[in-house]
């Protein structure tokens, strides 16, 4: 037998790629994500997400509830940005009812939508940084996040699942002192953001882990159906607050930050700059907010005040009927969407003329973003998968529903 010739008795086989599970118990999975990774050494060849571990049948449950009873389900979808989802649902019901929300209520809704955006981006940026190895931003910004939770609690009584934005307006007006406290927060939080930027923006390790990782071109972003930060990070200036304004956004002056490289670092910067813009929007709203009603003056849609119920039998009856039977919505169908912190959150409602929705389809931005995890991770190291999951800012409440 020649020197370099392989013996016919030796069996040769090609080395297969190594397959491993990532999650669902992994701390960097941000919930119940199960990834099946196909690895070629340290490089990712395929990432297959397995979802459904947090499925609760929300859309079906809503069909068995009145329009008011269905509202709290929306807080429990993306449980990091609660009021944004209530907002989309309320807009859809108001379209079907053809009712106009009072201007003060619109300003309050915008203030709380932007506070929710900050609430979400604080969690997104700090947990992303912590996944990569930076603990300090988490400790700094969660102190600020606690203040935002207090603002939630002061208007609704709940720190997370507020059920504050309701069809026809908001649950109650600002309590005494809240206006001043939000204004003070806006002034102080600006400088805390500056400190976080000083810590991360030029940090060598942070940039090594994020720059040129998870690049998505503008064409890819559109074909995947991206929205929100994931779309703007690829250089497309699309924001529903500008492109399809709702409430009082058309009366406000603010900028839309967009990226140019479509990588994780660009998306991090956009989230930080969006927090600056949210502070600017909140300040404008607090200054321009007029006095007036905070819910539609129609007792068939919104409940009467507690003080009225003590003296008026009619108000008591309205209140009882509203919470026991709800209100009938004219037979029709509509789609309403808001620029939620994670992207376009939409609600498609079909009414059959009864007091319960015939169908309620929820469009969650995170579902579309997670689909692209395979293409974004391909060719990267296994450690970069953690960075990409962090930059997608996914929450499984809305993905699994």
Curated annotation (Swiss-Prot):
<dbReference type="InterPro" id="IPR001135">
    <property type="entry name" value="NADH_Q_OxRdtase_suD"/>
</dbReference>
<keyword id="KW-0496">Mitochondrion</keyword>
<dbReference type="GO" id="GO:0005739">
    <property type="term" value="C:mitochondrion"/>
</dbReference>
<keyword id="KW-0560">Oxidoreductase</keyword>
<protein>
    <recommendedName>
        <fullName>NADH-ubiquinone oxidoreductase 49 kDa subunit</fullName>
        <ecNumber>7.1.1.2</ecNumber>
    </recommendedName>
</protein>
<comment type="similarity">
    <text>Belongs to the complex I 49 kDa subunit family.</text>
</comment>
<dbReference type="GO" id="GO:0008137">
    <property type="term" value="F:NADH dehydrogenase (ubiquinone) activity"/>
</dbReference>
<dbReference type="Pfam" id="PF00346">
    <property type="entry name" value="Complex1_49kDa"/>
</dbReference>
<dbReference type="GO" id="GO:0006120">
    <property type="term" value="P:mitochondrial electron transport, NADH to ubiquinone"/>
</dbReference>
<dbReference type="InterPro" id="IPR014029">
    <property type="entry name" value="NADH_UbQ_OxRdtase_49kDa_CS"/>
</dbReference>
<keyword id="KW-0249">Electron transport</keyword>
<dbReference type="InterPro" id="IPR029014">
    <property type="entry name" value="NiFe-Hase_large"/>
</dbReference>
<keyword id="KW-0520">NAD</keyword>
<dbReference type="GO" id="GO:0048038">
    <property type="term" value="F:quinone binding"/>
</dbReference>
<keyword id="KW-0679">Respiratory chain</keyword>
<dbReference type="GO" id="GO:0051287">
    <property type="term" value="F:NAD binding"/>
</dbReference>
<keyword id="KW-0813">Transport</keyword>
<keyword id="KW-1278">Translocase</keyword>
<comment type="function">
    <text>Core subunit of the mitochondrial membrane respiratory chain NADH dehydrogenase (Complex I) that is believed to belong to the minimal assembly required for catalysis. Complex I functions in the transfer of electrons from NADH to the respiratory chain. The immediate electron acceptor for the enzyme is believed to be ubiquinone. Component of the iron-sulfur (IP) fragment of the enzyme.</text>
</comment>
<dbReference type="InterPro" id="IPR022885">
    <property type="entry name" value="NDH1_su_D/H"/>
</dbReference>
<keyword id="KW-0830">Ubiquinone</keyword>
């Amino acid at each position: 037998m020649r020197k370099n010739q392989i013996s016919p008795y030796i069996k040769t086989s090609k080395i297969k790629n190594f397959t491993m599970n990532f999650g669902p118990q992994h701390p960097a999975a941000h919930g119940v994500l199960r990834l099946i990774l196909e690895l070629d050494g340290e490089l990712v060849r395929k990432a297959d997400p397995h979802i459904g571990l947090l499925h609760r049948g929300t859309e079906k449950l809503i069909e068995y509830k009145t329009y008011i009873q269905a509202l709290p389900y929306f807080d429990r979808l993306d449980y990091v940005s609660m009021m944004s989802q209530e907002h989309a649902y309320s807009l859809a019901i108001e379209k079907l009812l053809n009712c106009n929300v009072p201007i003060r209520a619109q300003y309050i809704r915008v203030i709380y939508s932007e506070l929710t955006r900050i609430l979400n981006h604080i969690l997104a940026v700090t947990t992303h940084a912590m996944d990569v190895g930076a603990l300090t931003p988490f400790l700094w910004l969660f102190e600020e996040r606690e203040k935002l939770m207090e603002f939630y609690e002061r208007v609704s009584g709940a720190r997370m699942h507020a059920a504050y934005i309701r069809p026809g307006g908001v649950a109650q007006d600002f309590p005494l002192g809240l206006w001043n406290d939000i204004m003070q927060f806006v002034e102080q939080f600006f400088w805390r953001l500056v400190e976080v930027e000083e810590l991360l923006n030029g940090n060598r390790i942070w940039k090594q882990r994020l720059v040129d990782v998870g690049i998505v071109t503008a064409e890819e972003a559109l074909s995947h159906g991206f929205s929100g930060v994931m779309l703007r990070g690829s250089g497309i200036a699309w924001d529903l607050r500008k492109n399809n304004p709702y409430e009082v956004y058309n009366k406000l002056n603010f900028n839309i930050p967009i990226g140019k490289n479509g990588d994780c670092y660009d998306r991090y910067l956009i989230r930080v700059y969006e927090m600056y813009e949210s502070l600017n929007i909140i300040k404008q709203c607090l200054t321009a907010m007029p006095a007036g009603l905070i819910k539609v003056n129609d007792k068939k849609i919104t409940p009467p005040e507690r003080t009225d119920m003590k003296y008026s039998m009619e108000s008591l009856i309205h209140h009882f009927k509203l919470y026991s039977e709800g209100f009938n919505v004219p037979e029709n169908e509509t789609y309403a969407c808001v620029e939620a912190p994670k992207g376009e959150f939409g609600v498609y409602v079909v009414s059959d003329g009864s007091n319960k929705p015939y169908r309620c389809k929820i469009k969650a931005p995170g579902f579309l973003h997670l689909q692209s995890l395979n293409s974004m991770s391909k060719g990267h190291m296994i450690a970069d998968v953690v960075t990409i999951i962090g930059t997608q800012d996914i929450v499984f409440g809305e993905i699994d529903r």
